[in-house]
Amino acid sequence: FDKESFLKAYQFGLLHESNGQDVPKSRSWNRLYAKAYLQLGGLIVAPRVWYRLPENADTDDNPNIDDYLGYGDLELIYPWGAHTFKLLARHNMHFNPQSRGAVQFDWTFPLWDDGLFGYIQLYSGYGESLIDYDKRTDRIGIGFALSR
């Protein structure tokens, strides 16, 4: 990243997400999004907002997904030596009994010098998968990453 500018990059796009299942387990949604990458010292701050593209009410397989996944998220990325830490948080911004959100923490670390990384992920909240977006999930993941 260039130290001269606070805004390092931005993205605009169309995001399609689907679980690839057939009805009745089918879940999908389409969003237009905007994301900025800002650098504050060694910390990268990446807010993203989205607009869900409307679907036909008769065929919408998750009509209340916005109530669980909200309208945006915030990602914090902190590279530290050969390690990378990421925190992703989202909330539906309903500060009442319908309040829903999620937080995800990722840690990648080198295993060897050939580009293979260890990966640990902690997740708590709603929207971890499309089929169960409306169910709260608490999960720990351990694995390998080929890139980061």
Go through the PLM ranges and name each one.
Residues 121, 129, 146-148:
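Flexible, glycine-rich linker and terminal segments associated
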